[in-house]
Structure formats: C-alpha cells, structure tokens
C-alpha cells in the first residue's frame, strides 16, 4: 500500500484557469497549487517524471489542435495607409502627434512594468503563452508557485507590449517616410524617441513632404498622359501608313511606266529633229535648182528671141517682147 500513488488531494476552492486573459495555467502551476493545499503531502516520483515528460514534449512543438485558445497577432500598421494622400495638413499633424504621444506613454509604461515584474514576451514571438509555460515548468518546480495575480500581470504586460510594438512599427514607418537628414554635434547622441518627435513636429518638413509627394504624383500623371498621347499618335500614323502604302506602290509603278514613255517620246523627238534637218537641206537644194533652171530658161528664151528677130520683121518683134515680159513676171 505504501508504493501506490496517493489519492487526489482535496481542495477547498478549485484553481480554474482565467479565460478572460487568454492564458491557460501550466501543469506546474496546478501541481504547486495542490502542494499548497496539502503541504504535508510530498510529490511522488511518478508526478515529477510526468511533469518532466510533459514539459519536454510541449517544448518541441508550438501549438496543436487540442489547444482551445489561439493568440492572434494585431494587424500590421501599413493597412491604413491607402488613403494617406487624402489627409490635409492638420489631420496629418494630429495623427503624428497622437502616434508620438502614445508611443512615449507606452514606452515609459513598458519600462516601469519591466522594472517591477521582469522580462516579458516580445510581440514578434509567434509562440503561444502555453508553450512558454511548458518550457519553464522545470524552473517553476524549483521555485515558488505563481499566483493568479501574477498570471493577470503577465497577460496585461503582454498586451501592453503588443500595443507598444505596433506603435514602434508605426513610428518607424513615419520616420522612413519623412526622409530625415542626419544630425551633427551633440544632438546626434539623443535617443530615437526625442529625435523622432522633433522631426514629426516640424510643420515645414511635413508640408515639404506633402508638396514633394503631390508634385511627384502630378509628374507621374503628366508622364502617363504624354505616353498615352504618343501611343495614340503612333497608332494613327501606323493606320495612315497602312492605308497609303498601297497607293504609294501604285503611284511608283505608274511613275516607272511614264518614265519609259517619256524616254520613248524623247527618242522620237530626236529622230524628228534630224528628219527636219534633212528636209530643210533638201528644200534649200531644190530652191537652188529652181533658180538655176529659171536662169537657163531665160537665157534660152533670149537666144530664141535674137534668132527670131533676125529672121522676122520688126512688126513681129513687138508681140514677142511682150510675151517675154509676161514670162519673167
């Protein structure tokens, strides 16, 4: 009977887990509560082995389907930046001031809680709180058992760290958008919180950022319009080229035919010019021949008249002279 495991210790009030803070109590915490209920009863060896086995097994994986609660990460800070260009100067300044105020407040509150409670979980860690509790079961067995108040404090600190991490991410994005210039001298040794606050509170820099963004947007719009106009002109010219190219080819063919006809006409004109020259020369020769024949005829007529005068009387000479005059005319 001495080697059998003892009965379950009777507890006056059950130590139920607090689901409102989204954290399940570990097995080590339950065992410690049982130990406080029965201080005279020592933990047997089989319970220690069970606790060690559960701690090593739960440390190897992150989360299983049997876990009833899932810890969701907060949405990223870049979701609400789609309508960032629509803010005016006053809304832009008020948004930056609220972010800096919340960031500084959460930062100081986080340091004060870390000084009193101890190191807490980071918001970037994707493991669940139950995994952290399972990994730290061996240490909790050697230390004092935690109370419900400590669990509540851990949950509050984790939520505040998540909010502080989100604010830090937003402030980092704002600093990257502001395009800040490096600081010289002793001002460069200041902390990032004070420098980011000074940069954000500068209205001239904010206005310059907004003006640069608007000018860049206008230039992009102008470039897109110019590109669209060029594309339209190119398409119209291409359609005109496609329409006029067959007409140009037809006109080129006609031009070649006309050039051939023109060359033939030129050759004919040259031949006609040579024929005209020959005909002119022949006409001149004919004119000279006519003059020569006329002179010969006149001489023969004179000889006949002389012969007839010698043979005929003077009465017959007068009509012959009249005939000769008529022939000369």
From Swiss-Prot:
The entry's keywords: Activator, Nucleus, Transcription, Transcription regulation
Domain bZIP: 202-254
Keyword Isomerase among record annotations: no
Family matches, as Pfam families: bZIP_1
Disulfide bond entries: none
Function of the protein: Transcriptional activator.
Protein name: Basic leucine zipper 61
Source organism phylogeny: Eukaryota, Viridiplantae, Streptophyta, Embryophyta, Tracheophyta
Gene: BZIP61
